[in-house]
Amino acid sequence: MPQNEYIELHRKRYGYRLDYHEKKRKKEGREAHERSKKAKKMIGLKAKLYHKQRHAEKIQMKKTIKMHEKRNTKQKNDEKTPQGAVPAYLLDREGQSRAKVLSNMIKQKRKEKAGKWEVPLPKVRAQGETEVLKVIRTGKRKKKAWKRMVTKVCFVGDGFTRKPPKYERFIRPMGLRFKKAHVTHPELKATFCLPILGVKKNPSSPLYTTLGVITKGTVIEVNVSELGLVTQGGKVIWGKYAQVTNNPENDGCINAVLLV
């Protein structure tokens, strides 16, 4: 047997202390508090490295939790494929309920320019930087002014991970993050509440597009799978562009018209 493993040897011979497992459980319970105290007291380069490590751990933990929570996976149905006439767009299903996953074709379409269609609002008032981005002063004496807070409605995807607050330049408040839009179909003359997939183009600035800022005239992509729209080839349409027609920051909701 290797040397210096006397504790393991003792445990093999006589077993654990009677309070060993209880002590271990309590120590693990205290660990979070001790780490928090340590993080608060640390300063300088050590603190930076420690916070970076903690931030990476938290991201990993959140991703693991999210992975366990995922239920919308591809599953086989026990029911057999219905006999008789089946629409063309259901032929490739083979009795499977598919998760709401965007195909590569839609991802490719997202990259195309939004200026392909005639939009309901061809001209809109440009939004100035002072209007959209509020200067946030930071530092002990509030002398630093490099942070900006978005004051308009914005869209943030599901897979978005914030940077550590210390290094985050653009702050997008939770109260201004929207995930759904009221989209009107111009031909059907009906309005649907559809999930937003992304911001295609904000006419005011490319910066607002990357930040996902939604103002009047912005072209957004919405999930139209619930409408049951089909292409000429018989495939279901997942994503379509729509233009925002109201001022969401004033109305508290996003109203848009589908670009057909």
Curated annotation (Swiss-Prot):
<feature type="short sequence motif" description="Nuclear localization signal">
    <location>
        <begin position="11"/>
        <end position="18"/>
    </location>
</feature>
<feature type="region of interest" description="Disordered">
    <location>
        <begin position="20"/>
        <end position="41"/>
    </location>
</feature>
<dbReference type="GO" id="GO:0000470">
    <property type="term" value="P:maturation of LSU-rRNA"/>
</dbReference>
<keyword id="KW-0597">Phosphoprotein</keyword>
<keyword id="KW-0698">rRNA processing</keyword>
<dbReference type="GO" id="GO:0005730">
    <property type="term" value="C:nucleolus"/>
</dbReference>
<comment type="subunit">
    <text>Component of the pre-66S ribosomal particle.</text>
</comment>
<comment type="function">
    <text>Involved in the biogenesis of the 60S ribosomal subunit. May play a part in the quality control of pre-60S particles.</text>
</comment>
<dbReference type="InterPro" id="IPR039411">
    <property type="entry name" value="NSA2_fam"/>
</dbReference>
<dbReference type="InterPro" id="IPR022309">
    <property type="entry name" value="Ribosomal_Se8/biogenesis_NSA2"/>
</dbReference>
<keyword id="KW-1017">Isopeptide bond</keyword>
<dbReference type="GO" id="GO:0030687">
    <property type="term" value="C:preribosome, large subunit precursor"/>
</dbReference>
<comment type="similarity">
    <text>Belongs to the eukaryotic ribosomal protein eS8 family. Ribosome biogenesis protein NSA2 subfamily.</text>
</comment>
<feature type="compositionally biased region" description="Basic and acidic residues">
    <location>
        <begin position="20"/>
        <end position="34"/>
    </location>
</feature>
<keyword id="KW-0539">Nucleus</keyword>
<dbReference type="Pfam" id="PF01201">
    <property type="entry name" value="Ribosomal_S8e"/>
</dbReference>
<feature type="cross-link" description="Glycyl lysine isopeptide (Lys-Gly) (interchain with G-Cter in SUMO2)">
    <location>
        <position position="80"/>
    </location>
</feature>
<dbReference type="GO" id="GO:0000460">
    <property type="term" value="P:maturation of 5.8S rRNA"/>
</dbReference>
<keyword id="KW-0832">Ubl conjugation</keyword>
<keyword id="KW-0690">Ribosome biogenesis</keyword>
<protein>
    <recommendedName>
        <fullName>Ribosome biogenesis protein NSA2 homolog</fullName>
    </recommendedName>
</protein>
<feature type="modified residue" description="Phosphothreonine">
    <location>
        <position position="81"/>
    </location>
</feature>
<keyword id="KW-0687">Ribonucleoprotein</keyword>
